Every structure is written in C-alpha cells, then in structure tokens.
C-alpha cells in the first residue's frame, strides 16, 4: 500500500510533521510494510517556513530583529534552492502572538522587523521571496518595513515618521532615493488569502483592527491615514491601487508589497503545494491522508486539506481527513474531494487536555489505526 500523508498543523498542538508521523505510526500498526510518504503542509500562515524548508530540502536560519513594539525578537526563516529563495513568516517579526492582549495597540506596532528580515536575507544572497503575511499585530500600511529597507518616509519637517500607525498620521514624503539597491533584483510572492482592500468598511482597519486592539475612534483615524498614505504613494508610484484585493492584508502590508515591490499576492496553499511538488507524490499513491485542527465549512474555502484533496482527485485518489474536531458544516468537504473525515478526540476531555501535544499525537495514531483496521477488514472480505 502506497500512502501519502499531508496534514496541516494542529495550531497550538501538533506541527504538520508531528501530525504526519503520528498518522504514519497508526498505519504501520496495520500495514507494517506500507510505503508511506509524509509531506509537510501549511496554508501560508503558521508553519509556512517549516513546510517549505522541510518540503524543499532547505535550511533554517535566525536573525534578531525589531519586534512589533520595538523589543528585540528572534525570527526564523528558511532559505531554499541554492540560497536564492527566502521563506519568511511576517508573524515571526510582527505577529500578534508576540504580544499579550494588554500590549496590543496598532497605533504603535510596527512592521520594521519584517524589513530587517528581508534585508538579512538579501545580505545572504537571496533574491526571491515567499512571504506569509498572516497573523499580524500591525496596521501601519507596511511603512515600518519600508523604512528598514531604506525608503525615506518623512513628515513635513523632513524627519522620519515614528513607528506604528501613528507614523501614517504625520507622513508627508515617500522617497525611494536611498532604498537598498538590491531590491531591484528581487521578486516577491506573497502568501495571502485575504481579499480586503486597504480602506473603507471592508478595509484592514475596520475588519481586523479590533482584534489588534483598536477601538472605534482609532479605526476611523487609521482608515483616514491609510487613505492619505495611498494618495501620497500614487504621486510617485502611479500604479498604486488601494482597492486591489488583498491590499488590506496584514494591516496594509499587502498594499506596500503591491505598490513598492510589484509583488504578486497568491493563495498560500497553492504556493505550498506547488513548491513542495505534492502532485508528484500523490499521483502514485493508493490513498491520501490530510487534515487540520478543525474541519469545518471554511475548510473548502482555500484551506490546506481542500488543496490536497483537489490534487488527489485530479489523479482519482481516495482522500481521508483527520482533525481535532469536526463541525456540522464540515459535510461541505465531501464535495471538495474529501471522501471521509474523522475527529481524533477520544472520550470526554477538556480542550486544554485534548490539545496537549502528547495527547493529540496519541489520539491521531489510535484513530488512524482504527480506520486502517477497518480498511483491512473490508479488503479481507473481498
């Protein structure tokens, strides 16, 4: 039996690789001689660096950068190919998980550290970038990142604006006269599944501001500042389009990548599946295993298991999914190519206990074992 396993991380519980190895253990209890291939999986958010670094045979490096509130943080990123492609998660430098709830305030949080990571990768010879921009703590329109890469963002007195969204309030000049020269050689693929524009009722301030600590007054102010920022950018960069789908991703970081770096915004899942060449493994499989922490109606909306299932169905392969929990609307997954799905939680336990790594790994192994025991039973009755 040839089995391909590609399971997304169970956030806060198991990494993609841990989930895959646990599933493999369960299969081998029933089919000890099975040919099992474990491929790392992510959707462009958490786990993207690990998935691409492991899946493409790259290396991981670390750099100390400016965190969202100015304190130093250690950010890991991957280097692929012959050292020319860097894989970065912006959340490693400016993520909301780096802050406590009381620290969250988008007026002050900055993307400066994201620019520092890019700068470090450029210094190491990287010229191609894959960047996941989910999980941000910021709403600064990417101006912090731009400053770290040499852009001059000045107030009316010619002084560099401060970090955070407050810098947008005072912004009067945007100049690329002193930008890092190597940027002209760089390409950027941005893993982004958010389609929000920069401003307005569906813009980043209104939709994502509250979870980053913004109150209604701050939301209104930041939206106005971002609108003025876009108008200012258009004077020097005619292709500026704040209404572009995804411009509002990561507090306007998507806008900065589109406007100043001519980046492409792409489905995070598609980037992962393409770069790790998952189809090359699935085409020879007898069965495909996927999953994620929670399987629900949103799974079919561009999440990793649906991407795996789509490839599997191109080769007419059966797909089984395993998850921590399954909601009522998860039935939509059947139409997306997932033939059957199974929750791995066994017995009445607290959420905290169910998410403990050792507990989750054991549950994955035991559940997969029982499913494959059933498969063997039906095979033996033929």
Regions flagged by a language model, labelled:
Residues 1-133, 137-382:
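N-terminal loops that bind phosphate or other acidic moieties
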């Amino acid at each position: 039996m040839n089995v391909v396993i590609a399971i997304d991380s169970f956030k806060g519980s198991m990494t993609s690789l841990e989930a895959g190895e646990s599933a493999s253990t369960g299969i081998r209890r029933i089919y000890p001689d099975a040919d099992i291939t474990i491929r790392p999986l992510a959707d462009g958010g958490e786990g993207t660096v690990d998935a691409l670094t492991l899946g493409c045979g790259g290396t991981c490096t670390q750099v100390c950068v400016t965190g969202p509130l100015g304190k130093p943080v250690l950010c890991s990123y991957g280097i692929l190919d012959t050292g020319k492609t860097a894989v970065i998660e912006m959340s490693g430098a400016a993520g909301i998980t780096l802050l406590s709830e009381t620290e969250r305030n988008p007026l002050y949080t900055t993307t400066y550290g994201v620019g520092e990571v890019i700068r470090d990768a450029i210094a190491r010879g990287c010229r191609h970038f894959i960047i996941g921009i989910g999980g941000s703590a910021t709403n600064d329109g990417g101006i912090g990142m731009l400053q770290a890469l040499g852009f001059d963002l000045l107030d009316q007195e010619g002084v560099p604006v401060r970090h955070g969204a407050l810098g947008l309030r005072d912004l009067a000049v945007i100049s690329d006269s002193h930008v890092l020269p190597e940027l002209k050689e760089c390409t950027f693929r941005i893993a982004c599944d958010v389609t929000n524009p920069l401003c307005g009722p569906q813009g980043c301030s209104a939709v994502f501001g509250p979870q980053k600590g913004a109150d209604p007054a701050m939301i209104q102010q930041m939206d106005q500042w971002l609108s003025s920022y876009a108008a200012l950018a258009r004077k020097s960069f005619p292709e500026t389009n704040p209404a572009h789908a995804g411009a509002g991703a990561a507090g306007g970081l998507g806008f900065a990548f589109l406007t100043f770096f001519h980046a492409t915004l792409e489905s995070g899942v598609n980037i992962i599946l393409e770069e790790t060449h998952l189809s090359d493994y699935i085409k020879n499989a007898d069965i495909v295993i996927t999953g994620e922490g929670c399987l629900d109606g949103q799974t079919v909306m561009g999440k990793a298991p649906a991407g795996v299932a789509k490839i599997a169905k191109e080769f007419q392969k059966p797909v089984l999914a395993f998850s921590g929990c399954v909601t009522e609307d998860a039935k939509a997954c059947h139409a997306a190519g997932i033939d059957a799905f199974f929750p791995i939680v066994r017995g009445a336990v607290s959420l905290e206990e169910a998410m403990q790594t050792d507990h989750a790994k054991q549950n994955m192994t035991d559940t997969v074992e029982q499913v494959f025991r059933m498969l063997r039973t039906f095979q033996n009755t033929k």
